[in-house]
Amino acid sequence: MYSRKQGSAGDSMFRATIDRLIANRHLPFALMHRASTGNRLELLTGELSTIEALDQLPDPDHDGDGDGGARHDLLLLMPFRQIRERGFECVDDRAPMWLMRVTEQHEADRDTAVAWLPDHPVVLSDAAFDKDDAAYATIVRTILSEEIGRGEGSNFVLKRCFLARLDHHDTAAALSIFRRLLERENHAYWTFAISTGEGIFIGATPESHAMLADGELCMNPISGTYRYPADGPCANGLVRFLGDRKEADELYMVVDEELKMMASLCEDGGHIVGPVLKEMACLAHTGYVLRGACDQPVRDILRETMFSPALTGSPLESACRVIRRHEPDGRRHYGGVVALIGRDADARPALDSAILIRTADIDPQGQLRIAVGATLVRHSDPQSEAAETTAKLSCLLQAIRGDAVTDQPDTPVHATVLGALPGVQAALRQRNQSLADFWLRAADSRRRQYGGQLSGRVLILDAGDNFTHMLRCQLAAMGADVAIAPCDGAFAMDRFDLVLVGPGPGDPQDADHPRLRALRRITRQLLAERRPFLSVCLGHQVLSDILGLPLRRLAVPQQGVQREIDLFGQTCRVGFYNTFVAIADTDRIEPQGMELSVEISRDALTGEVHGLRSERFCSLQFHPESVLSRDGLDVLRYVTSQLMYSPHQVPRTATARS
């Protein structure tokens, strides 16, 4: 039976339940403050179990119990190892996926309820990082040289763990930590204490994972960290941070990754709102909000959004391999998700979820573990990344220890006015000036602006990077009928007017990798059958190699780099994600035995090839679909229309295209 109490009766039940939980440490519960609930605390109790996969997630309860209003049915704690459900690699540390069927839900005013919580001192012993700064910096250097430097991806998140032992670790101690977090960290997305009856999770996470409300899916990519100086944040320091290209690049790459997720779940993909400044007690982050209409089941949303690129890297599948190689002890729940699943007042599915970061994981023996990480990009400084992990730990650690709050009552961090400091809003707006307008427009605006510019059927071959879903959104918005198929799967190319050989991670010269073998076979077939095709990034590199152009590893990878280039006589600002590049010393080649004349767009100084084109194909080293490609949609429209509608194209009959 489901029970929910509000008002004075709810306050009494809330307080009585707190007392009951303190008296019995083995009762499972969830005590939360969520940004979407205003000044309310929520207290949930229920039946706790574990499940192995999201397919075992029960459907929301619609049995009519309760008051008929909005309600929570399920609380889910997803460990990082669930990424296996997407077929990605991970260390299987056997961390459980906890599921609570909510039977009681109580609410109380936050300011009132805080006074009902204990405020006991907590003593830590044997406190230290599992990897000191020097050891962490060494691994950072290894990832920069051996992973990013070899083309495995554009950015990766490396964690380390702060370990300690709590001398007292009962429910009263846990609620004391929660109380101090509430008092110190006013701007978290979720602040929570969740007991499994065995261990407990206590955290203040700044980052939403995914929210479904009124048929709209929202995600909140956050990246880039401004660490407050000892004397507090200031306008000049914050504006310098907002103008730092390294910090902006981190965020843009995360936005691209989450746009991929939105594009796989929403028919029209997501659109970008922001940027926004996420203020926390000890630091601030930059982020965006992504929105899109979505009719997918909650379990599918949770599966397809495993897990935030801000906590893994890009491309996601490649990032998981890198994490497995460099974090042999596993991640447990770090980077996983805590989710509330239920229904709204109109009985529609509802989801609110947060990323499990800035979270203490305390086991039944009182062993505390706090995982923190930093995003590594091509120009990361190892010592600075180590310092960033320490900064991310500081507020939670202060709340655990009960350290005195620094007396800075007039600083912006306490007044919550960082966004109002001189120059900050202009610096935030400036971040959008070089981004692709397509992703800044909502779906209806895109249809009005771009609809009807293309027709015909396009087959996108997925080579292991979900940028393909963003390409689908752009082509579909312009009017094309688009299908996606794995490059190593079965498909009928003769049913389509154009084949797009998609991007993917890896070394284009790796003759043994199954995906690369498939790309070579397909590209040779397209050339032999003289079918119109467009190749992007890895597909472009494979084509270049087949045509006889040498490939070279870049000394400095172009991962998440925006450049202004000359593309066949047109100036374009576009985004690159590549470690390898084709090289040419001429503007045209005629490959031996192919009866082709191929025009080359290249950097006049370095010989790096930006694109190739011939009568029936075109290729692009950059990603026209990336949020970094300000002119990407114009390029995509031009090359696809040229390939589909040029005189060589034989019209398809209605039967052949069905």
Please give the residue ranges for each predicted region.
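A short, well-structured beta->alpha microelement
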Residues: 14-15, 49-66, 476-493
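Non-catalytic accessory segments adjacent to catalytic cores
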Residues: 36, 46-168, 172, 214, ...
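Acyltransferase
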Residues: 416-453, 625-658
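Flexible gly/pro-rich beta->alpha loop and the following alpha-helix that scaffold active-site loops
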Residues: 457-459, 465-535, 541, 547
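Pocket-forming structural segment of enzyme catalytic cores
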Residues: 520-536, 540-634, 638
